[in-house]
UniProtKB/Swiss-Prot annotation:
One of its GO terms (cellular component) is perinuclear region of cytoplasm. The active site is at C823 (glycyl thioester intermediate). This is E3 ubiquitin-protein ligase HECTD3. Pfam families: ANAPC10, HECT. It comes from Homo sapiens. Residues 219-397 form the DOC domain. Pathway: Protein modification; protein ubiquitination. The modification N-acetylalanine is found at A2.
Length: 861
């Protein structure tokens, strides 16, 4: 009876086309701020529940009926019940006695909070069990998360089955699920067809309700809120031991055996010890367990031990059938879902690792997690929507939490339908068709998609080329580059910049040499070798990463007090004025016509997206949106570039004539100033035409158009370079925020993130150096931690693995400066007298130790 889950095979092309029609209509409704299609909000008026079949359970139970002041989202002191944001909750008013084999009739309206899953009963349904109890409605707790199993489970409705047979003469099951109603509504078919069960109209209207002030931007904020909060749900999955009798593996090493799969420690792992492509994990499931989710914990830093493709089989004995085939994102550190939404018990589930990254021979898995239907999927937790959780989302503040909860439920339904067809739309869909364009308009919703990461990985893998047969060797003079950075006017052609030295060094030496295509596998993590003139380094990756960091700093300097040494980007007006948001950002220079180099910048961005390296470019969302193909708007995006101008035009639009003439007189002409301080005419001869009061609307539109398109050609060149390296389908699947993060890394370097990425070697757990190290990093600012990260790894953003060893001189020195080797991302940590001294030495090294002397080898070439 359940509809196809994400990634499931749809029953027919008719069903696929119907869902695409639905998505197009829903996308238009979302963009326009209209209610979503009614089929998406379907709630059956009647659902039957019975006691869960548990031989050890009681033969009857008393089900308390709770009453609230209307449906709400809070739990009061009276007990675990749905409630409202105002007024006290009432305690349980009565109880329904339910014996094994008997049923209780409820509506299909559900609510989930911290106490569990609730279903609603109408006055008529209550009367069947309690007579005239005086309640207008009541709520039953179907299951609690802590109970480990559902007390009540839904069943088919015999009355509905009988009525359908009498009415249509066909033995149809009633359509009770919203997915089926969507298919019935939007899929064209001949002949008789099932009919949906009677809808609970009041619940449908509550789901469809859109507040008068609600906009598409509110939906986007709600999606980001869910993305930020639901990302942690997999951390709370039940222990595998609840559902599995035993776990067998194909092979294992003595130190990293099968117990590491269930120890809830991401630092340990099971490692195989066998033949290539012959690795498996076999789960013997406990009787009655139905898998809702099966997740594997993987880590991209395992390199060629990381699984790349997993196939899951299930069944009984040796009669196993293929259930799923999953490609894993090679950049992932965390959980990947390899099986979900099973409807029957599978005695045996076998996870076969058919391919590892870079054709690795053995595999590492850091954990297995299971969510079972014995512990029913409760759904979205209404407790999320408390005012304290909404502070970062001003558009959502002030909206009734009940409204936010229902809207979120509806958006999750939309995402589920989108997931079921996404692999049909990307990458094979014709981009010229209107339907695809409409779905792209709601790209931010892809954040919640479960299918997208696998599709992105597949598109990148299918378009990658083999690694180059040789590694380019570049000779870089950073002393000249630093002199140029200090005074760019002495070198107008920017020949001494690291950027130019690398660009020229990578040019093919003759017509037979192919230029780099940057589409190599992610494992190929050093694109060229650097020889820094007059610096001690043998480049095994650290010098290369340093060259990328130097180019990033030249393109978009991190300090507002230094000149911009290259002509490709200029500071935003916000940075120059010290006003508005995003005061450290840059935009492409409208005057720079060197499109070949812009295209190369785009290629470097694509290479960073494909690999593990970063090109840190401080560009506002206004630019990233254009690169990823998302729409930009004046009111939403341009304040990050020039907030003063946006405000000025807004005020000008509402001015009366007297104020306008007093403010501008005859001085305002049809011209505007671009980000590079170039004055351009908005109309032919505009510099000599005064803007009158009646012309102001036209003037405003012309200014907005000119500024929005000021760097259109430069962005187009960058995008052309990006698309030479990354398929269009990948840009279609990534939001602009994700594109920025994949190219530039995560600007927030938190201590928690560093803890996950740091490995201490040859240290005792009680060693004071470990304690002092973390105390020091806790006292660092984000900028300090970013500088420290670059000192150790050559990267200034996460993720980047760090290996820490004791100082080479051991106990002979105290309070010395730390040393690092960026090629191996290694820090050599000395002894310190206190955490304060440790903090001072680490900070000094992070800001002052630029040359990479510890990479010098005694064997010179």
């Amino acid at each position: 009876m359940a509809g196809p889950g994400p990634g499931a095979v749809l029953e027919s092309p008719r069903q696929l086309l119907g869902r695409v029609r639905f998505l197009a209509e829903a996308a238009r409704s979302l963009r326009a701020g209209r209610p979503l299609p009614a089929a998406l909000a379907f709630v059956p008026r009647e659902v039957l529940y019975k006691l869960y079949k548990d031989p050890a359970g009681p033969s009857r139970v008393l089900l308390p009926v709770w009453e609230a002041e209307g449906l709400g989202l809070r739990v009061g002191a009276a007990g675990p019940a749905p409630g409202t944001g105002s007024g006290p909750l009432r305690a349980a008013r009565d109880s329904i006695e339910l014996r094994r084999g008997a049923c209780v009739r409820t509506t299909g309206e559900e609510l989930c909070n911290g106490h569990g899953l609730w279903v609603k009963l109408t006055k008529e349904q209550l009367a069947e069990h309690l007579g005239d109890c005086g309640l207008q409605e009541g709520w039953l707790l179907v299951c609690r998360p802590a109970e480990g199993g559902a007390r009540l489970v839904p069943i088919d409705t015999p009355n509905h089955l009988q009525r359908q047979q009498q009415l249509f003469g066909v033995d149809y099951r009633p359509v009770l699920r919203w997915e089926q109603v969507v298919d019935l509504t939007y899929s064209h078919r001949l002949g008789s067809r099932p009919q949906p069960a009677e809808a609970y109209a009041e619940a449908v209207q509550r789901l469809l309700y859109v507040p008068p002030t609600w906009t598409y931007e509110c939906d986007e904020d709600l999606i980001h809120f869910l993305y930020d909060h639901l990302g942690k749900e997999d951390e709370n999955l039940g222990s595998v031991k609840q559902y599995v009798e035993s776990i067998d593996v194909s092979s294992y090493t003595e130190e990293f055996n099968v117990s590491c799969l269930t120890d809830s420690n991401a630092d340990t792992y099971w490692e195989s010890d066998g033949s290539q492509c012959q690795h498996w994990v076999r789960l013997t499931m406990k009787k009655g367990t139905i898998v809702k989710k099966l997740l594997l914990t993987v880590d991209t830093t395992d390199d060629n031990f990381m699984p790349k493709r997993v196939v899951v089989y299930g069944g009984e004995g040796d009669n196993l059938k293929k259930l799923s085939d999953v490609s894993i994102d090679e950049t992932l550190i965390g959980d990947v879902c390899v099986l979900e939404d099973m409807t029957v018990h599978l005695p045996i589930i076998e996870i076969r690792i058919v391919e590892c990254r870079d054709d690795g021979i053995d595999v590492r898995l850091r954990g297995v997690k299971i969510k079972s239907s014995r512990q029913r999927e409760l759904g979205l937790n209404a407790d999320l929507f408390q005012p304290t959780s909404l502070v970062r989302y001003p558009r959502l503040e002030g909206t009734d939490p009940e409204v936010l909860y229902r809207r979120a439920v509806l958006l999750q339904r939309f995402i589920k339908i989108l997931d079921s067809v996404l692999h049909h739309l990307v990458p094979a869909w014709d981009h010229t068709l209107g339907t695809f364009s409409e779905i792209k308009q709601v790209k931010q919703f892809l954040l919640l998609s479960r299918q997208r990461p696998g599709l992105v990985a597949q598109c990148l893998r299918d378009s990658e080329s083999s690694k180059p047969s040789f590694m380019p060797r570049l000779y870089i003079n950073r002393r000249l580059a630093m002199e140029h950075r200090a005074c760019p006017s002495r070198d107008p052609a920017c020949k001494n910049a690291v950027f130019t030295q690398v660009y020229e060094g990578l040019k093919p030496s003759d017509k037979y040499e192919k230029p780099l295509d940057y589409r190599w596998p992610m494992r190929y993590d050093q694109w060229w070798e650097c020889k820094f003139i007059a610096e001690g380094i043998i480049d095994q990756g650290g010098g290369f990463r340093d060259s990328l960091a130097d180019m990033s700093e030249e393109l978009c300097p991190s300090s507002a007090d230094t000149p911009v040494p290259l002509p490709f980007f200029v500071r935003t007006a916000n940075q120059g004025n010290g006003t508005g948001e995003a005061r450290d950002m840059y935009v492409p220079n409208p005057s720079c016509r060197d499109f070949a180099k812009y295209e190369w910048i785009g290629q470097l961005m694509g290479a960073a997206l494909r690999g593990k390296e970063f090109l840190v470019l401080a560009l506002p969302g206004f630019v990233w949106k254009q690169l990823s193909g998302e729409e930009v708007s004046w009111s939403k995006d341009f304040p990050a570039v020039d907030s003063v101008l946006v405000k000025l035009l807004e005020v000008m639009e509402g001015m009366d004539k007297e104020t306008f003439e007093f403010k501008f007189g005859k001085e305002l002409t049809f011209t505007t100033v671009l980000s590079d301080q170039q004055v351009v005419e908005l109309i032919p001869g505009g510099a000599g035409i005064v803007v009158g009061y009646g012309d102001r609307s036209r003037f405003i539109q012309l200014v907005q158009k000119a500024r929005l398109e000021e760097s259109k050609e430069q962005v187009a060149a960058m995008q052309a370079g990006l698309l030479k390296v990354v398929p269009q389908a990948v840009l279609d699947l990534l939001t602009w925020q994700e594109l920025e993060k994949k190219v530039c890394g995560d600007p927030e370097v938190t201590v928690d993130a560093l803890r996950k990425l740091t490995r201490f070697e040859d240290f005792e757990p009680s060693d004071s150096r470990v304690q002092y190290f973390w105390e020091a990093l806790n006292n660092f600012t984000n900028e300090d931690r970013s500088r420290f990260l670059r000192f150790v790894t050559g990267r200034s953003r996460l993720p980047a693995r760090i290996y820490i060893y004791p100082d080479k001189l051991g106990y002979e020195t105290t309070d010395a400066l730390p040393e690092s080797s960026t090629c191996s991302s290694t820090l050599f940590l000395p002894h310190y007298a206190s955490a304060k001294v440790c903090e001072e030495k680490l900070r000094y090294a992070a800001y002052n130790c630029v040359a990479i002397d510890t990479d010098m080898s005694p064997w010179e070439e």
